[in-house]
Amino acid sequence: MTGDGLDWAMISVPVDLPEVIDRISYQRVVENAGATWDYFPGHFDPKYAQAQGNPTIYVNTMHLAGFADRVATDWAGPRSRVVHRSMRLAAPVYAGDTMIGRGRAVAKRRDTSVEPPRCLVDVEIRVINQHGALCCPVELTLQVPGSSGDG
């Protein structure tokens, strides 16, 4: 790894990614919903969330997607980018919870269908809460730089 992040040739799979921990405050849940223009009341109105059967407000889908992306790109470095993401919402992450992201790079490949070819790494991420409950399984693909300048 250089200061610019990982180079595709340097990556051996499978490899575990460093764990990322994020404590979710009430304020962040509300701010994130507003910043992403997601005005569904379950993200900012505790009475509405409770009427749905939740103990309090909960993070939105974009918050979870951004967190999963962070798990992958913090590992791969600033020259990496997410080119594909598939995720499933399994359980809510509530205000006051701690999100824990655990990832694993499981495959790497070169996409020669484009010019220049893209260097890709497939990553599986599990977003869990502080109780160990699976909140969001994620599969994503990163494009990373190649040693020959392609990527």
Predicted stretch roles:
Residues 74-101:
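Mid-chain, well-packed structural core segment of small domains
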